[in-house]
Amino acid sequence: MERPSIQPVKLLKAISSTLYKYLLGKFLGLGLQINSFDFPEGYLPVPTPARHYIDTFLNEFDSTVRGRVVEFMPPFYQERYIGRSEITSYDVWDVVPSTPATIVADLQSAPTVGEGSFDTILCTHVLCNIQYPWLATREMHRMLDTGGLVLCTVPMILQGYAPHPGDYYRFTTDSLRTLFEDYSKVELRSYGNPATASGSPQYLMCNHFSSRVLNYHDPVCPSIVAVAAWK
């Protein structure tokens, strides 16, 4: 019986993959000793791939932001939208009294906020810090006016994000689809790839990746996932 032939290209690829994984494991082990595991100082928001992907998502739906808008603390996108003619009001929401919050309430149950109060809700990397996110998506649905829109991003892979009041969840597109299943229309997005996703716990910033790598999106292993959901 003849021995099966092995194509040189496949063999080289297998060897390269094995060597890469070996070297990566060594470098990650070394990183435990020399990596500072913190964000660069002087940036707000911090220039992470996740923040880049949030901007990419909001850019896609930029023209849909209108009417009475609310954003959850910190209001990174207030300057982007406030002052536009199509924006009639802009609230900032926090769970505790703070500046510049105009609404103080628990998103899981906010009876002081009326039904149909908003036309657009900006919820960027908030649900991961909410103990019962299904209650939050239900409340956002209640607070939206008919035809209103939630623009929501969540991490799929991320280091400890914001421990106050808690850091509870990471999400997939399937979990977002379930959380927003009561909305009339849902559009899901995923951003990032295994390189940017694995770089997150290493505190790698956008400048650590080439533009080609940063803007390559692999739905199997993204950094963040997002949803545009209409009432």
Language-model segments: residues:
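Internal hydrophobic scaffold segments of catalytic domains
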Residues: R3-T18, P47-T48, F171, R177-R189
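Conserved SAM-binding loop and adjacent beta-strand
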Residues: Y43-I54
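Conserved SAM-binding loop
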Residues: F61, G67-A162, V227-A229
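Membrane-proximal basic amphipathic "stem/tether" segments
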Residues: M1-G42, I224
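S-adenosyl-L-methionine-dependent methyltransferase catalytic module, highlighting the catalytic core
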Residues: W134-L135, E139, T146-K231
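Acidic/glycine-enriched edge-of-secondary-structure segments
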Residues: D38-P45, D94-V96
